[in-house]
Amino acid sequence: MHRLTPFVALLLTAQVLAACVAQGARPLPQGAFRAKDAQIYSSAVLDPARLVGRWKQVAGFGPPGACKPGGVEITRGAGGLRAVWRLCLGGQEARGSAPMQPAGPGRFDVAGQAWWVLWADGDYRTLAIGTPDGGFGFVLDRSGGISGDRLRAAREILAWNGYDLNRFVSY
């Protein structure tokens, strides 16, 4: 029977641990800003009526300086909520106008994309919005002058929902 020397046993243990760490890492898919297998939760207590108004983009994901922050105007009409936006999403400017079709608590289908409100502060001054596929995420604020504590809270919520904060950009 063969006996392992302490050095060989240590070497094998290090290799096993390295393999476990490598398997536990979740690389983000190309162009996505969150791990696809991470949990994501929308705000179950969101009051959609309180979303109406003008919002300024104060943060998002993508390369710094790739585009300028934008905003969203949400209106209420006979058909429900409607969004008109110009946003920096993933480092590219996106513009559009579409109904915000309810798709569950805190969840909307906007122009064929899932916009999930992950968090709104208690006074509806700040929103963290994400999408299950991780293609974008952004933070909106009514004033544009977001406080440090609300920005920190939005970052924490995005991280908790699997977003890669190394790619987070504050404007």
Sequence positions of predicted segments:
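Flanking scaffold residues of small Cys/His-coordinated metal-binding clusters
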Residues: 12
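A beta-rich soluble binding module of mature secreted/lumenal proteins
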Residues: 2-4, 15, 20-171
